[in-house]
């Protein structure tokens, strides 16, 4: 147990140090209240497939922006629920809301890129915001985004939303996965013009139109499941100015409402985020378990075998560092402190989802999402 306890502590110190330094480089976007010098025309492009639960609230929040010069284009991606009925009814009431009944999915495309490509074809804006139908926007979001783009002379702004956790399973699994994604994103590198590392969040991809056209738009990522990350990579490879930032003050999301939705939603792409590498996925699964689960096990084992007090103390120090980091994550995500004790279970479930995603990708050679199957 001495070697295990020592290794465990050094591993925890390494992870805590990396996460702490990484967060220093996280840029946060805050609301802009003053008037802008100019209000360039914005086209907000929203793909919607079976989004009857959320689409009305999302579109209403977009239409209620304190920005005077924009349009909202919603493309129904062949939904089999009431999504098209809801949006088309709203479009009759708002002149700046355009509803498009999307074409059947074309060969060589995945659903979301194809829907956004159709929205782009109808767009008139100097700026293009590609977003999702399950978001809720604050009224200052567009004004703040334009202000940020202009002041920082950006070609692409991509933002992370605030996250809403409803059910028990959301509070168990989602914080662990969001923390995991944040740990994969080296904020210093992705915001460095001299480094090729890139990150994109499909919930908020805000382009200058000419920059979007320069990289070939969504046509250039037509068959990608992780189209948001890939289009951000293309932007950086083409020398565009890209900013990845925290946009919690601008918009929020409740991604999934049940364990089944969480499982199916992350299974489709979490292994792809590992670049389909078994080694990479195994490494990160081990790191997640060693950080969030094994500190409890090491403490209990040291107490069980009657280890010397110094080793019990070292194992407790490791657990304390893990808990402190977990409390920081709870604060960042707006969760109650007691939620930190759910993270070990969340780590186990995240690993199970990763393994399921791995098997689906490597053995079945396919990805499934919203009733569609994409062959790998």
Where are these regions (language model features)?
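Membrane-embedded multi-pass helical conduit in multi-pass membrane proteins
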Residues: 283-364
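Cell-envelope/extracellular polymer assembly enzymes that use nucleotide-activated donors
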Residues: 40-43, 71
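Acidic donor-binding/catalytic loop of UDP-sugar-dependent glycosyltransferases
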Residues: 82, 131-148
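Long helical/loop segments within the catalytic core of UDP-sugar-dependent glycosyltransferases
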Residues: 98-118, 144, 148-206, 210-214, ...
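Short, well-formed alpha-helical segments that are part of the catalytic scaffolds
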Residues: 25-32, 51-64
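N-terminal membrane-anchoring/stem segments of glycan-assembly enzymes
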Residues: 1-38, 175, 350
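Acidic donor-binding segment of Leloir-type glycosyltransferases
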Residues: 59-105
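Catalytic donor/gating beta->alpha subdomain of glycosyltransferases that bind UDP-sugars
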Residues: 149, 156-181, 210-213, 218-281, ...
């Amino acid at each position: 147990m001495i070697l295990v306890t020592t290794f465990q502590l050094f591993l925890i110190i390494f992870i805590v140090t990396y996460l702490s330094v990484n967060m220093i480089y996280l840029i946060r976007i805050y609301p802009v209240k003053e008037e802008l010098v100019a209000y360039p025309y914005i086209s907000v492009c929203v793909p919607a497939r079976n989004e009857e639960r959320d689409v009305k609230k999302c579109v209403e929040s977009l239409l209620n922006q304190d920005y005077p010069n924009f349009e909202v284009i919603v493309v129904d991606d062949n939904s089999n629920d009431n999504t098209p009925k809801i949006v088309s009814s709203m479009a009759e009431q708002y002149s700046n809301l355009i509803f498009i009944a999307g074409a059947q999915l074309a060969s060589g495309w995945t659903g979301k890129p194809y829907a956004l490509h159709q929205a782009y074809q109808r767009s008139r804006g100097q700026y293009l915001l590609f977003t999702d139908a399950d978001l809720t926007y604050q009224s200052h979001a567009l004004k703040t985004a334009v202000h940020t783009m202009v002041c920082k002379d950006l070609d692409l702004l991509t933002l992370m939303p605030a996250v809403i956790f409803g059910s028990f399973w959301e509070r168990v699994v989602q914080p662990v996965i969001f923390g995991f994604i944040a740990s994969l994103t080296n904020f210093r590198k992705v915001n460095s013009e001299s480094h090729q590392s890139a990150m994109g969040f499909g919930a908020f991809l805000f382009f200058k139109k000419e920059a979007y056209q320069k990289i070939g738009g969504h046509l250039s990522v037509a068959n990608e499941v992780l189209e948001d990350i890939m289009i951000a990579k293309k932007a950086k490879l083409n020398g565009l100015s890209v900013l990845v930032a925290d946009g919690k003050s601008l918009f929020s999301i409740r991604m999934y409402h049940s364990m089944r939705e969480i499982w199916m939603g992350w299974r489709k792409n979490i292994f792809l985020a590992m670049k389909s590498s078994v080694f990479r996925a195994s490494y990160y699964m081990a790191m997640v378990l060693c950080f969030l689960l094994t500190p409890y096990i090491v403490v209990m084992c040291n107490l069980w075998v009657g280890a010397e007090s110094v080793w019990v103390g070292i194992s407790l120090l490791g657990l304390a560092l893990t808990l402190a980091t977990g409390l920081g994550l709870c604060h960042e995500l707006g969760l109650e402190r007691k939620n930190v004790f759910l993270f070990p279970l969340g780590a186990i479930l995240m690993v199970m989802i990763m393994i399921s995603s791995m098997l689906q990708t490597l053995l079945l050679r396919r990805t499934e999402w919203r009733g569609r199957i994409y062959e790998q």
